[in-house]
Amino acid sequence: MNAAPGRPKQARTAARQGEGIPMNGHAPLAITLGDPAGIGPEIIAKAFRQAPDATRGAFVAGDVAAMRRASQALALPGQPAWPVARIERIAEAAAVPPGCIPVLQVVAAPAEDIVPGRISAEAGRVAGHCVVWAARAALRGEIAAIVTAPLHKEALAAAGFPYPGHTELLQAEAAAHAGLAVDGMPVRMMLANDELRTVLVSIHMSLRDAITAVSFGSVLETLRITHRALQRMLGRAPRIGVAGLNPHAGEGGLFGSEERDIIAPAIAAALAEGIDAHGPYAPDTVFMRARARPGVPGSGEFDVVIAMYHDQGLIPVKYLGVEKGVNVTLGLPLVRTSPDHGTAFDIAGTGRADASSLVEALRMARTLAGA
């Protein structure tokens, strides 16, 4: 798999102009625009307005006009829109006064080509190139972390990006930067809130393919990546619970043999490497065992649950509140977080989108990056 399509002229110009770190020595956080036909620009504007502590020193990698349209749409009756400040270099983000949204012009999103709530190749192009620009800036050390606003996978594909989502696009960029094949840089997706964390063995694929993807190697690699990442986050070895693939974790082979033949041997191999992993457990109860009491970190039986496929892991976290969830990509040589929701085309342009998950993603990114 190759890296993403080359950047347009606007992105190349922004990359040249964006070089440099602020004079305080701290690289800022970059927030990618997301799909401009979705709620990305809106929740970014709301985050700057509602959570100045989380957005402090951050900037938007995107399109100035798109952010101004979003800010204007959110203006309260009788009050001016939240100002959007165009910056020419990354280093200028720190100097933008509070009450402004700093935007580095990465790629144009013409209003006539973007319709709120409508899938289009143009919107996918804009969203994809913002992510590519941010990935390359992070890999050069120019930004401390990337916080990605939602993109639409169908629009991304229509624009010619051969990736099912952010995670795979960032993986390809990081692998290319390191001179590796994509499979030489394995990554995993973690969804987390203040009560529960889960890491997925497979990400964006059909359920049929996800079952096939459960192998000794993929489960062991997931355990290794999770152990390393959570050890850095927590400052100690994490307690890892592993969900089975089948109902009741296979019930001793009655409902499937994957637990006995694949998952349990991978856990045993991880234990031999010093990883504190346990299971496989019945998928319908392991998440409850891992759930921490609100406000009491670490009070669950496990710090994280390894889920065998996308919906098995994401449903429990999202059920606890989409507004609290944060997506973290593990295994990359950069920090990337995102809100735990999509483009919400059904409410795009209405001003109803909730920025809470984006704010939590910003706070998580700042913590992970030490920014």
Can you say where each PLM-predicted feature lies in the sequence?
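Contiguous, glycine/small-aliphatic-enriched amphipathic segments in soluble metabolic enzymes
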Residues: 2, 9-12, 16-169, 175, ...
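Small-molecule pocket liners
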Residues: 58, 167, 187-188, 196-199
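FAD-binding core/adjacent interface of flavoenzyme oxidoreductases
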Residues: 171-186
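Ligand-binding beta-strand-loop-alpha-helix segment within the catalytic cores
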Residues: 182, 190-213, 217-220
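Glycine-rich, flexible loop segments associated with nucleotide phosphate handling
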Residues: 182-190, 298-304
